[in-house]
C-alpha cells in the first residue's frame, strides 16, 4: 500500500516556495483525463515511497497558470504527463509520457 503520496501544488507562489526550501525537487504535471498520466502518477508515487521522499504534482486542467509558468521557467515545451527534477531551482532533467517510471526517475538523481 503506497501511503506516501505526492503533494499537490496549487499556485506559482507555492511552487517557488518549494524550490526555495528544497535543494532537490521532483515535480509531475498530471493530466486527469489521460491514461498514460494515470500510470505516470502511480509510478511517481511508487518512486517517492521507495525513496521515502516528498514530491510534488499539479493537475494541468486545474493549474493552467502554474503549468505555463513551469514551461517558461524551464524552457521545456509543455507535455502531460511530464516530470521534472529540480536541483537548486534549476530543472536538470525532464521526461514525458511513457518515459516517466520508477527507473527513469531514479536515473534523474544520478
What does each of the following model-derived ranges do?
Residues 1-4:
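Short, Lys/Arg-enriched N-terminal segments with co-localized hydrophobic residues
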Residues 6-13:
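Short acidic-hydrophobic, aromatic-tinged amphipathic segments that line or gate anion-handling sites
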Residues 16-47:
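Local sequence-structure signature of Cys/Sec-based thiol-disulfide redox active-site neighborhoods
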Residues 29, 53-67:
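Thiol-based oxidoreductase modules, predominantly thioredoxin-like and allied folds used
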Residues 48-53, 104-105:
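Short cysteine/histidine-rich metal-coordination sites, predominantly Zn2+-binding motifs
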Residues 74-87:
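Structural micro-motif
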Residues 85-110:
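Non-catalytic, surface beta->alpha helical segment in thiol-disulfide oxidoreductase systems
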Amino acid at each position: 500500500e503506497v501511503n506516501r503520496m505526492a503533494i499537490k501544488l496549487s499556485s506559482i507562489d507555492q511552487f517557488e516556495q518549494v524550490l526555495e526550501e528544497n535543494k532537490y525537487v521532483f515535480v509531475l504535471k498530471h493530466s486527469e483525463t489521460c491514461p498514460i498520466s494515470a500510470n505516470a502518477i502511480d509510478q511517481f508515487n511508487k518512486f517517492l515511497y521507495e525513496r521515502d521522499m516528498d514530491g510534488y504534482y499539479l493537475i494541468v486542467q486545474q493549474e493552467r497558470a502554474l503549468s505555463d509558468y513551469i514551461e517558461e521557467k524551464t524552457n521545456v515545451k509543455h507535455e502531460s504527463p511530464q516530470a521534472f527534477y529540480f536541483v537548486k531551482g534549476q530543472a536538470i532533467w525532464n521526461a514525458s509520457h511513457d518515459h516517466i517510471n520508477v527507473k527513469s526517475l531514479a536515473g534523474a538523481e544520478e
